[in-house]
């Protein structure tokens, strides 16, 4: 099961290389965000931290993303959204795709989220 999830992550990031990436583990709270050059923009282990506030995402966008994530399932793993955020001191519109990771061992939701973000052209 862990090997399947790792392969799913590798395949997702390979298909979406050249963009900023997000990797979040729900059980540990470990979050890593990398920029296009694969440099760490943000890393944390505190599950109580408000990531959206850190990147200046407005409340409406936060609720929209949370609502979309709530609708994901083993069959419907991905969501897409366009949000305004501040990354590396640059506030602009970003499109993001989030892919939820699931395990048969956890019945009540996803075990992680991976994703990418890129500026809206």
Question: Locations of the language-model features?
Answer:
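Short, charged amphipathic alpha-helical "coupling" segments at sensory-output junctions
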Residues: 2-13, 120-121
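PAS-family sensory domain signal
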Residues: 9-54
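PAS and PAS-like sensory modules
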Residues: 21-23, 77-87, 96-97
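Glycine-biased flexible loop/turn sites that connect beta-strands or occur in inter-domain linkers
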Residues: 29, 89-91, 105-109
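Solvent-exposed interhelical
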Residues: 57
């Amino acid at each position: 099961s862990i090997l399947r999830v790792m392969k799913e992550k590798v395949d997702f990031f390979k298909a979406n290389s050249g963009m900023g990436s997000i990797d979040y583990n729900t059980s540990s709270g470990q979050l890593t965000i990398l920029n296009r050059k694969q440099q760490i923009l943000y890393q944390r282990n505190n599950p109580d931290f408000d990531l959206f506030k850190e990147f200046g995402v407005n409340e409406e966008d936060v609720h929209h993303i949370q609502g979309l994530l709530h609708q994901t399932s083993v069959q419907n793993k991905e969501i897409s959204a366009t949000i305004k955020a501040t990354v590396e001191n640059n506030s602009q519109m970003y499109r993001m795709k989030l892919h939820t990771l699931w395990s048969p061992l956890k019945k009540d939701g996803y075990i992680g989220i991976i994703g990418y973000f890129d500026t809206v052209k």
